[in-house]
Amino acid sequence: MAKDATRIRRRERKNIASGIAHVNSSFNNTTITITDAQGNAIAWSSAGTMGFKGSRKSTPYAAQVAAEDVAKKAQEHGMRTLEVEVAGPGSGRESALRALQAAGFTVTSIRDVTTIPHNGCRPRKRRRV
């Protein structure tokens, strides 16, 4: 008989003072990942993991709640300063950035890293509402 196969693994507390916040805001969702300088993930959250479903995931408020959650997780690891990389066309870009600043982080730089095709793939058809 196999017993206690599910063992609770505690996340060890890393002492990292500065990191990079990657805010990816699509038309449907907003994901925020905080990494160290090498790109190793420290904490992450999204509008979907915060309990928003459907079209509510794409709202600025959902991005703000996700940013507050990931900020709390990152501050447990001792993080104080952030560089912010924003990508995507979504509506949660600015509100996520404002929520990170309001959580007490010192934002040293803000970069827009949205990829722009040099006439790559054919875009999807226009919506007719």
Curated annotation (Swiss-Prot):
Family of the protein in this entry: Belongs to the universal ribosomal protein uS11 family.
Subunit structure and binding partners: Part of the 30S ribosomal subunit. Interacts with proteins S7 and S18. Binds to IF-3.
Species this chain originates from: Rhodopseudomonas palustris (strain ATCC BAA-98 / CGA009)
Annotated function: Located on the platform of the 30S subunit, it bridges several disparate RNA helices of the 16S rRNA. Forms part of the Shine-Dalgarno cleft in the 70S ribosome.
Signal sequence region: none
Descriptive protein name: Small ribosomal subunit protein uS11
Top-rank taxon, per record: Bacteria
Keywords: Ribonucleoprotein, Ribosomal protein, RNA-binding, rRNA-binding
